[in-house]
């Protein structure tokens, strides 16, 4: 038995498979950060930190002895509970293909948004510096007129090239900006197609946890997401009508360079 205690849950294999697939599909649909950073691991739930490669001086109490302490990025542990009905579980055994897994979807969305917020906007309380606040480049203003969005992206691309950051470049858009870009045209030509041509090999990525937009290089080596325990489902408790489960993951995030992104802000 591991730390997830799944063996104690009154859930047969076929129902587990449906729950896991729903969680995986929803998480993947909502996640954006993993598409633009280097991902290492998973190395296991027991992993608690990743080295930054730096040290700091520690006052020595012995004459002639130097003491250094290695600096690490401690992992954070995300967990979100959800409840499924035993009716939905048992219906799978009866051959149902339409059990209600909405609680699974809601939990997967919650944890995906939390991971992306940490990567993109940081989590000060946990010592995680996000890509947006850590950028050394001045933010480019998102224009009021969506027809001018391509000009803002061109400006951001120019910034990255000027500071020597190679592509490919990807453009992350908040839900609101993604909708505007996808639904708008400029003299009959789709704005999204114009942006795609600007990016070349890069992607336009829906990022619901992002505020505004973000142009980032995906050349590699700039940002690292270190997974301890990747997204997993664990068991809390059950009664005669419901089973309480949870989604959990652990990770640390390192922003290794500060010049390889340009925020686009409202």
From Swiss-Prot:
Can be used as a bionanoreactor following immobilization on a glass surface. Nanocompartments filled with a fluorescent-labeled protein are stable for 5 years at 4 degrees Celsius and are taken up by mouse macrophages. Keywords: Encapsulin nanocompartment. It is found in: Encapsulin nanocompartment. It comes from the Bacteria. GO terms for cellular component: encapsulin nanocompartment. Belongs to the encapsulin family. Family 1 subfamily. Other cargo proteins can be targeted to this compartment. This is Type 1 encapsulin shell protein. The gene is enc.
């Amino acid at each position: 038995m591991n730390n997830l205690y799944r063996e104690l849950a009154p859930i047969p294999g076929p129902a587990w498979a449906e729950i896991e697939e729903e969680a995986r599909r929803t998480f993947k649909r909502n996640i954006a950060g993993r598409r633009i950073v280097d991902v290492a691991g998973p190395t296991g739930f027991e992993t608690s930190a990743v080295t930054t490669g730096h040290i700091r001086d520690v006052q020595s109490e012995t004459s002639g002895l130097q003491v250094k302490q290695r600096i690490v990025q401690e992992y954070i542990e995300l967990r979100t509970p959800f409840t499924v009905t035993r009716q939905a579980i048992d219906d799978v055994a009866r051959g149902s293909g339409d059990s209600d897994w909405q609680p699974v979807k809601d939990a997967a969305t919650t944890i995906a948004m939390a991971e992306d917020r940490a990567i993109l906007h940081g989590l000060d309380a946990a010592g995680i510096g996000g890509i947006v606040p850590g950028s050394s480049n001045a933010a480019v203003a998102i224009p009021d007129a969506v027809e001018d969005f391509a000009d803002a992206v061109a400006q951001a691309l120019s910034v990255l090239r000027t500071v020597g950051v190679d592509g490919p470049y990807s453009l992350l858009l908040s839900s609101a900006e993604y909708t505007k870009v996808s639904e708008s045209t400029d003299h009959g030509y789709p704005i999204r197609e114009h942006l795609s041509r600007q990016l070349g090999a890069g992607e336009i990525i829906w990022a619901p946890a992002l505020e505004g937009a973000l142009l980032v290089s995906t050349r590699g080596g700039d940002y690292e997401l270190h997974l301890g325990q990747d997204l997993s489902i664990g068991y809390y408790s059950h009664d005669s009508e419901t089973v309480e489960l949870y989604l959990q993951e652990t990770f640390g995030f390192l922003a290794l360079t500060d010049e390889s992104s340009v925020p686009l802000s409202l």
